[in-house]
Amino acid sequence: VRYEECTQDEVIPTETQYVETSLFYRKQSKEQLIRQGSDGLCSVSYRETYVDGELTDTTETNRETVIEMVPTIIKHYDEQAPVSSFVGPEIVDGKPCEGIAATYTAQRSTGYSASPTAKGSSGRRLTYGTVAVNPNVIPYGSLMYITSADGRFVYGYAYAADTGTAMMTGSAFIDLYYETYSESVDNAVIAVNVYVLDSDTAAKYKEENDAILEADNTPGL
């Protein structure tokens, strides 16, 4: 019996991960490439067993990743999937199950975008899940849930972080922040229901939402 040790490289094929969003509710077949993935590489060690000069067994003895696989990430449409990553109370029948302090139905929403480092008039960094309001109606820092009545478009939980002329003059009730100009154009005017949470309920989710904001360093994800 003779043993031989050998090593060979194996490719780790890239995988595709999908991110669901209702952002594309007007173009439901649209897919957006968020990140192009790449194959990884691993080094695999084997022990080969030879009997009377013939290979009779091959046993893997070690596997080490040399290059990590990077998955491809694609964003696509899914009804009722929120645009925002922020969280709040469970949604039941299209609205938060607890803590609603004020409800505004069939309100005119518009869309806007800014630079990745932009901050709203409240001082908060703008991301998906930050919106412009009339702060005399909805105070800065308020947590709210925003959705179309039919659920085909769900912006999700959002914080009042900015204002603008349209909100102050009443030509729009709320301006939803998007991370690209094209997204803001695609979703320019939408009739939405806005459910503003009371401060005690919002406070329950502050720590988790602060962590989500801190982790959100990659536009489009």
Q: Residue spans of the language-model regions?
A:
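Solvent-exposed, well-ordered loop and adjacent helix/strand elements within mature globular domains
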Residues: 77-221
